[in-house]
A protein has these predicted regions:
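Structural beta-sheet core signal
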Residues: 5, 44, 78, 162, ...
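Glycine-rich phosphate-binding loop signature in dinucleotide/nucleotide-binding domains
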Residues: 34-38, 154-157, 286-288
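Accessory, non-catalytic peripheral segments of nucleic-acid enzymes
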Residues: 245-417
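N-terminal active-site segment of His-dependent metallophosphoesterases
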Residues: 1-65, 71, 390-397, 417
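Short histidine/acidic/glycine/proline-rich micro-motifs that form metal-
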Residues: 48-50, 82-86, 300-302
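His/Asp/Glu-rich metal-coordinating catalytic cores
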Residues: 41, 54-67, 72-229, 233-242
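Acidic/glycine-enriched edge-of-secondary-structure segments
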Residues: 18-22, 50, 129-134, 257-274
């Protein structure tokens, strides 16, 4: 008997058409591989989708692929991830469950003493007992685990599988994923397999009382940093597990995605003009046809602004050479003339406000309304305005002017200013 374990597909994350195709092709390859290998069931512990209700293009694709798996007689067991979670069951996950293409495994009951108990579902073909908890927003899943009735789950007999979505502090990883991590001890002991999601690199470890704690990693990319990892040789795919009364083997199955070209430039103690020249030289004669190109510029400029490092011409040249997409990373590029001081906060909005507060003193403007407290408030409002998502059925030629006009109105400007 065997099952497949995949996670963090993040369907709908990619905005560039070329990457959207790869995103879907990789997922399609995995499900086709599961059908070909005749797995008994599939586990997906979260972040199947990048948001709880993705655009219709993504939903149509997902429904077609899950129907094919369903028609092949392979059940799919899932929990929410932190991206596709919905507290009111208002997610495409729930639509897929409603039509019977997937099964949500979390069956939780809250008790008067504050404890939360979980029921195990039994896979009808193999007899495997499956349960788990969804990933929640803002690290609230830890509160659930602290209230979890672990003893009743540990008392269950037979081959048991626990699905979870979140970071485990005991697991050594360089995934760089943000968010709180919890100790492994919050999970029930004695399960045969712990199917993890959230961490984007493959990781398989066993501990005393916890055998086979496994993250398959993302099959392609759920963040821009994943593309860079892919380019640097990170293997992507899913996990195939053979079992009888116990787990017999855990194997990583690699699924290839695309070719990459990485261009790195060290800007430390250099002027922007020098960096621009090196970029032009490094990209002049390279073959980028049908490749994802990643340009990474890091270091501290000795003079000039980070904006003076202009990649627009280089990007155009690479696109003219038929690169699939050109992804530029300048988030580790700073300047001696202006450097951003980091700040902390209890939530996203507070962090943003604190960053503005820490850094606004470096700015010099002739307009006092752009400085001090008024400048901080304006910056926060502007960031919120620029971060608005497209409305349902809104086209780009409607979305862009709407956001532009709102931003100009905040600044007290108009199109002619």
């Amino acid at each position: 008997m065997k099952f497949a374990h995949l996670s963090d597909v993040h369907l709908g994350f990619q905005k560039h058409e070329s990457l959207q195709k790869i995103e879907q092709q990789v997922f399609e390859k995995i499900l086709d591989e599961c059908i070909t290998r005749k797995v008994d069931f599939i586990l997906i512990p979260g972040d199947l989708f990048h948001v709880n209700i993705p655009e219709m293009r993504v939903q149509k694709f997902a429904f077609a692929k899950f129907r094919a798996v369903h028609d092949a007689g392979i059940p799919i067991y899932v929990v929410y991830g932190s991206h596709d979670f919905s507290p009111v069951s208002n997610s495409v996950i729930d639509l897929l469950a409603e039509v019977g293409y997937i099964t949500k495994v979390t069956d939780a009951t809250s008790h008067e003493d504050g404890q939360i108990s979980l029921k195990c579902l039994v896979d009808p073909k193999t007899g495997a007992k499956i349960t788990g908890l969804s990933g929640l927003k803002v690290g609230k899943d830890r509160e659930w685990y602290e209230k979890l009735d672990r003893e009743s789950l540990e008392a269950e007999q037979g081959l048991k599988i626990f699905l979870f979505h979140g970071g485990i502090s005991d697991m050594k990883t360089d995934s760089g994923m943000d968010g709180d991590q919890m100790p492994l001890s919050l999970l029930p002991q004695g399960f045969s397999y712990y199917a993890g999601g959230h961490m984007h690199k493959f990781n398989h470890q066993s501990f005393d009382g916890y055998s086979n704690v496994v993250y398959p990693g993302t099959p392609f990319a759920g963040y821009h940093a994943d593309l860079e990892d892919n380019a640097n040789g990170e293997k992507r795919g899913f996990v195939l597990v053979e079992f009888e009364d116990t787990v017999k083997s855990v194997d990583f199955v690699e699924i290839e995605n695309t070719e990459y070209e990485v261009i790195e430039v060290d800007a430390n103690n250099r002027k922007a003009e020098s960096v621009n020249q090196e970029l032009a030289e490094k990209t002049a004669d390279i073959d980028v046809q049908n490749k994802v190109v990643i340009i990474k510029i890091q270091g501290e400029l000795m003079a000039g602004k980070t904006a003076d490092v202009d990649v627009s011409i280089v990007r155009d040249n690479l696109n003219n050479k038929d690169a699939l997409v050109v992804n530029v990373s300048k988030n580790q590029l700073t300047s001696k003339e202006y450097s951003i001081t980091e700040a902390k906060g209890s939530n996203k909005e507070e962090i943003e406000t604190n960053v503005f507060s820490e850094n606004i003193g470096q700015l010099k403007f002739d307009y006092p309304e752009l400085l001090e407290e008024s400048g901080i408030k304006l910056a926060a409002k502007l960031l919120q305005e620029l971060g608005q998502s497209k409305l349902e059925n809104e086209k780009n030629n409607e979305y862009v002017p709407r956001i532009r006009d709102s931003a100009l109105a905040l600044l007290g400007l108009d199109d002619d200013s």
